[in-house]
């Protein structure tokens, strides 16, 4: 479909095939949406397919485009596809149950459809109107239709971007823990970073740190926000998050998603703060908690990882932890904590060998 002959053939097939074959063709197109959307011919066919698809398939296409709106908004063809979907009556009907939201979106539709380069002043006024009510802003960005609109509005002007940023910051937790809202937050960060405004970039990263504990309670999008932030390997960001989770590392280590966050933090060599804070918790915790940690499916991995990192980077931490674990080794033998016992026993033997070696010298 991306080649001229393939494009002509696809156009003919859509014009003459029966309902069953059209549906099959729509399904094939759906599976290759991202590839087709980046090609001139493919994008034309894609728009035609979405237009003729039944309501069930239109809904599937709308879902897929909303999920990938961020990557689509990175190029002109993708933006034209988003605009095409926004202009469909089917898409407009998805918000008709909320009159206030529906009317506001109709105003955005009007501005966005006037020309390829929408009237920035009108967009700014509409975005400001949206911000008068934080609940309305939140409802707007978490709908598929609203999310698509924001994706193609972001980056058109600094004034409009500042308004959207204010909305994201005001409802930060709600936005970042929502599937579509999360994507708006990521796009907002990238728009300001691309413009060279690193202050905004740092503000968002600081907000992630401030709300770190709350975000850990959301194993889906909250966890995804963490992974994105930590994978930036930004020293201040890692430190913000580490401090935001202070006194909760052991608690998180018992949870599947929580242990993943702790592991990512202590693995991020750009900052030693997470390692120090985890050590403080382990040193302070009682023996029962330490045994539970060593014998827990997720906690065991954190303790093992911590021992390895402490030995490599903080030998004093490693020594303190070995001293704390030594009296507990018998209760760990024959359990999931056997690997911890093996590490301590190996270290003990190494120390003995060193002492003997020094004595012989």
UniProtKB/Swiss-Prot annotation:
A GO cellular component entry from the record: cytoplasm
PUM-HD domain residues: 5-348
Compartments in which it is found: Cytoplasm
SUPFAM superfamilies referenced in this protein's UniProt entry, alphabetically: ARM repeat
Swiss-Prot/TrEMBL GO biological process terms: regulation of translation
GO molecular function, one term: RNA binding
Designated name of the protein: Putative pumilio homolog 22
Organism: Arabidopsis thaliana
Lineage: Eukaryota, Viridiplantae, Streptophyta, Embryophyta, Tracheophyta
């Amino acid at each position: 479909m991306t080649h001229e002959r393939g494009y002509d053939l696809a156009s003919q097939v859509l014009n003459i095939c029966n309902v069953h074959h059209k549906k099959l063709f729509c399904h094939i197109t759906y599976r290759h949406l991202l590839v087709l959307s980046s090609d001139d011919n493919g994008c034309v066919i894609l728009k035609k397919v979405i237009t003729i698809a039944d309501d069930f398939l239109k809904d599937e296409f709308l879902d897929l485009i909303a999920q990938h709106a961020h990557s689509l908004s990175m190029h002109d063809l993708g933006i034209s596809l988003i605009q095409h979907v926004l202009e469909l009556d089917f898409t407009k009907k998805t918000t008709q149950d909320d009159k206030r939201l529906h009317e506001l979106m109709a105003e955005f539709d009007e501005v966005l459809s006037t020309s390829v380069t929408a009237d920035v002043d009108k967009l700014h006024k509409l975005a400001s109107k949206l911000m008068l009510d934080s609940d309305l802003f939140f409802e707007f960005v978490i709908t598929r239709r609203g999310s698509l609109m924001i994706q193609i509005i972001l980056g058109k002007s600094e004034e409009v971007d500042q308004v959207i940023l204010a909305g994201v910051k005001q409802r930060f937790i709600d936005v970042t823990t929502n599937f579509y809202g999360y994507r708006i937050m990521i796009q907002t960060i990238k728009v300001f970073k691309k413009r060279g405004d690193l202050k905004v970039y740092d503000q968002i990263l600081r907000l992630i740190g401030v709300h770190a504990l709350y975000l850990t309670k959301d194993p889906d999008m909250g966890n995804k926000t963490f992974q994105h932030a930590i994978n930036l390997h930004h020293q201040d960001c890692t430190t913000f998050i580490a401090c935001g989770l202070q006194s909760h590392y052991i608690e998180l280590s018992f949870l599947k998603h929580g242990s993943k966050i702790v592991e990512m933090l202590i693995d991020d060599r750009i900052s030693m703060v997470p390692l120090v804070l985890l050590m403080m918790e382990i040193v302070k915790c009682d023996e029962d908690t330490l045994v539970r940690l060593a014998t827990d499916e997720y906690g065991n991995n954190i303790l093992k990882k911590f021992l390895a990192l402490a030995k490599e980077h903080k030998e004093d931490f490693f020594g303190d932890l070995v001293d704390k674990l030594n009296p507990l080794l018998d209760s760990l033998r024959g359990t999931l904590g056997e690997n911890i016992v093996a590490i301590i026993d190996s270290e003990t033997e190494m120390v003995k060998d060193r002492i003997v070696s020094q004595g012989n010298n």
